[in-house]
């Protein structure tokens, strides 16, 4: 029982997940893998603990949506249920820490990948207009030593251009760069 002015022990644990980790009950080294440090594992564990609001050591769909939103990711209900379905290896309908870590490292990797694609886009968009034109593509082709005529370059733009304005926006470029197959 808690003394007057103190939280009950269970509430103290929930309010201080980092101390719980440092006390030896959680070993981040067990989850470290290439590209992921112990510090990053601890940060993700802290997020997990914060969003495991009922203290069950698992995150349900409602808790996952709040976690993803707070970490800056779009979290539509359909996406949340699909993530749980994809990651819930034990069929519980919830995500434990190992499953959460897998999800978050995939999302972090995706976010980093988008930043890398933005850098490549900026190389094409030399005037920083926010889109790639035939002129931009012609310049890059010339710099790379490619001998392509305007009709070939225009065909490339037409394939990437989703709204028919003869310009390739970053979203168009990103969609092409992340496509698994090309039609």
Swiss-Prot record:
Just give the chief location class. Answer: cytoplasm
Recite the UniProt keywords alphabetically: Calcium, Cytoplasm, Cytoskeleton, Metal-binding, Repeat
Residues annotated for Ca(2+) 1 binding in this entry: 52, 54, 56, 58, 63
The residue ranges of the EF-hand domain are 39-74, 75-110, 112-147, 148-183
State the residue spans of region: Disordered. 1-30
The record, for SMART domains, names: EFh (SM00054)
**Its domain of life?**
Eukaryota
Question: What does the entry list as the binding residues for Ca(2+) 2?
Answer: 88, 90, 92, 94, 99
- SUPFAM superfamilies xrefs: EF-hand (SSF47473)
- Name one matching Pfam family: EF-hand_7
UniProt GO MF annotations: calcium ion binding
Q: Which PROSITE patterns match?
A: EF_HAND_1, EF_HAND_2
Location comes to: Cytoplasm, Cytoskeleton
**Function per UniProt:** Plays a fundamental role in microtubule organizing center structure and function. Component of the infraciliary lattice (ICL) and the ciliary basal bodies.
Q: Which family does it belong to?
A: Belongs to the centrin family.
Q: Subunit info?
A: Monomer.
Question: What name goes with this protein?
Answer: Caltractin ICL1f
Lineage of the source organism? Eukaryota, Sar, Alveolata, Ciliophora, Intramacronucleata
């Amino acid at each position: 029982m808690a003394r007057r002015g103190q939280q009950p022990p269970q509430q103290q644990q929930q309010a201080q997940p980092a101390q719980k980790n440092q006390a030896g009950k959680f070993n981040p080294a067990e989850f470290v893998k290439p590209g992921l440090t112990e510090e990053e594992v601890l940060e993700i564990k802290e997020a997990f603990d914060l969003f495991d609001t009922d203290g069950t050591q698992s995150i349900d769909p409602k808790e996952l949506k709040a976690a993803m939103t707070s970490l800056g990711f779009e979290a539509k209900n359909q996406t949340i249920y699909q993530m749980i379905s994809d990651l819930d290896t034990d069929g519980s309908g919830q995500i434990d820490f190992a499953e959460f870590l897998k999800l978050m490292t995939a999302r972090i990797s995706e976010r980093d990948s988008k930043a890398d694609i933005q850098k490549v886009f900026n190389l094409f968009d030399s005037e920083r207009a926010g889109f790639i034109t035939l002129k931009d593509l012609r310049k890059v082709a010339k710099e790379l030593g490619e001998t392509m005529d305007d009709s070939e370059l225009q065909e490339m733009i037409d394939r990437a251009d989703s709204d028919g304005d003869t310009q390739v926006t970053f979203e168009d470029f990103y969609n092409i760069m992340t496509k698994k197959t090309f039609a």
